[in-house]
C-alpha cells in the first residue's frame, strides 16, 4: 500500500465556521483517496493472481477412488486365482471284526508263504558264494543207491574195488526188503549192519568175497520171507 500523506494543516482561517468546513472536506478527501488506493492495490493483486493462474496448468481434479465392492464376481476371481486344495478324504479306520480279520489273514497267508519260499530259495543260491563250505555227509545207503560204486582210496586194488561195488547194491536190496519187517533176519549170525561194516573196513579179497556170499544169502532169505507173507 502507498504511504499515507502527512496532513499539512493550513493556517487557521479567521472565520471559525469556514475553518471547520474546510477541515471536514479535507478529511473526506483523504478518506476517499485512501479507499481508492486500497481498491487499486486489491485490483493489482487480483490481476497478478489471474496471470499466475493462467501460466500454471490447472491441476486435474482427483476424485476419490471408490471402495472395493464385495461382489460375486470379485469372489469368483479370487477363487480362480488361488489354487484350490484337494478335498480331505475321510480317514478310514481298520476293521477289527473277527470275521473280516480272519478272511484277510487267510488271503494274505499264501502270499506270505510264497514270499518266504522265494527268500529261502535266494538264500540257498547265495550260500555257495561263501568262503567256508561244509561237505555233506554221505551215508552208505546213499552211496549204494548212487550207482552201486563205492569211492575208496585210489591205491586200492581193482579186485577188492569190484567186490565192494558188488556188495553194496546187495546190501541196499536187503535194506529195501527189510523195511516193514518186524523180525530182523541173520545169516551165520551176521545181520545187515555187520555185513555193512565188513564191506567198509575189510581189505583182504577173501574177507570181501565171504561178505558178498553172506549178503546174497541174506537177501534170498528176506525174499523168501516176503513171499510167504
UniProtKB/Swiss-Prot annotation:
Tell me the protein family, please. Answer: Belongs to the adenoviridae splicing factor family.
Superkingdom of the source species: Viruses
In its UniProt entry, the species of origin is given as: Human adenovirus C serotype 5 (HAdV-5)
Q: What is known of its domains?
A: The tiny Arg-Ser repeat region (RS repeat) is necessary for the splicing enhancer function.
Question: Main localisation, per the record?
Answer: host cell
**Compositionally biased spans, kind Low complexity:** 55-64, 71-82, 100-122
Q: What is this protein called?
A: Protein 33K
For this protein, the record's InterPro entries field holds: Adeno_L4-33K/L4-22K (IPR021304)
Cellular component (GO) terms are: host cell nucleus; viral terminase, large subunit
Q: Note on file?
A: All late proteins expressed from the major late promoter are produced by alternative splicing and alternative polyadenylation of the same gene giving rise to non-overlapping ORFs. Expression of packaging protein 2 and splicing factor is controlled by a L4 promoter distinct from the major late promoter.
Induction context? Expressed in the late phase of the viral replicative cycle.
Q: What does this protein do?
A: Promotes alternative splicing of late transcripts by promoting splicing at weak 3' splice sites. Required for the temporal activation of major late pre-mRNA splicing at late times of infection. Induces the splicing and expression of the late capsid vertex protein.
Compositional bias segments (type: Acidic residues):
14-54
| Sorted UniProt keywords | Host nucleus, Host-virus interaction, Late protein, mRNA processing, Phosphoprotein, Viral capsid assembly, Viral genome packaging, Viral release from host cell
GO BP term (any one) = viral DNA genome packaging
Modification(s) after translation: Phosphorylated in vitro by human PKA and PRKDC. PRKDC inhibits, whereas PKA activates the splicing factor.
**A Pfam family recorded for this sequence:** Adeno_L433K_22K
Which segments carry the region annotation RS-repeat? Answer: 178-198
Amino acid at each position: 500500500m502507498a504511504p499515507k500523506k502527512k496532513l499539512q494543516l493550513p493556517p487557521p482561517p479567521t472565520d471559525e465556521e469556514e475553518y471547520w468546513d474546510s477541515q471536514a472536506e479535507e478529511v473526506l478527501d483523504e478518506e476517499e483517496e485512501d479507499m481508492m488506493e486500497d481498491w487499486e492495490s486489491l485490483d493489482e493483486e487480483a490481476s497478478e493472481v489471474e496471470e499466475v493462474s493462467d501460466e500454471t496448468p490447472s491441476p486435474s481434479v482427483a476424485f476419490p477412488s471408490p471402495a472395493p465392492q464385495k461382489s460375486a464376481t470379485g469372489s469368483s476371481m479370487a477363487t480362480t486365482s488361488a489354487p484350490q486344495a484337494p478335498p480331505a478324504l475321510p480317514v478310514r479306520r481298520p476293521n477289527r471284526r473277527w470275521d473280516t480279520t480272519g478272511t484277510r489273514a487267510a488271503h494274505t497267508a499264501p502270499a506270505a508263504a510264497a514270499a518266504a519260499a522265494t527268500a529261502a530259495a535266494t538264500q540257498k543260491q547265495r550260500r555257495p558264494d561263501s568262503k567256508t563250505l561244509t561237505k555233506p555227509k554221505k551215508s552208505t545207503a546213499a552211496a549204494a543207491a548212487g550207482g552201486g560204486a563205492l569211492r575208496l582210496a585210489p591205491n586200492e586194488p581193482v579186485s577188492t574195488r569190484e567186490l565192494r561195488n558188488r556188495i553194496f547194491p546187495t546190501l541196499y536190496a536187503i535194506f529195501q526188503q527189510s523195511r516193514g519187517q518186524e523180525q530182523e533176519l541173520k545169516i551165520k549170525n551176521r545181520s545187515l549192519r555187520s555185513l555193512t561194516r565188513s564191506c567198509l573196513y575189510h581189505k583182504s579179497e577173501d574177507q570181501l568175497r565171504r561178505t558178498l556170499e553172506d549178503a546174497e544169502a541174506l537177501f534170498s532169505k528176506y525174499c523168501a520171507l516176503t513171499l510167504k507173507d
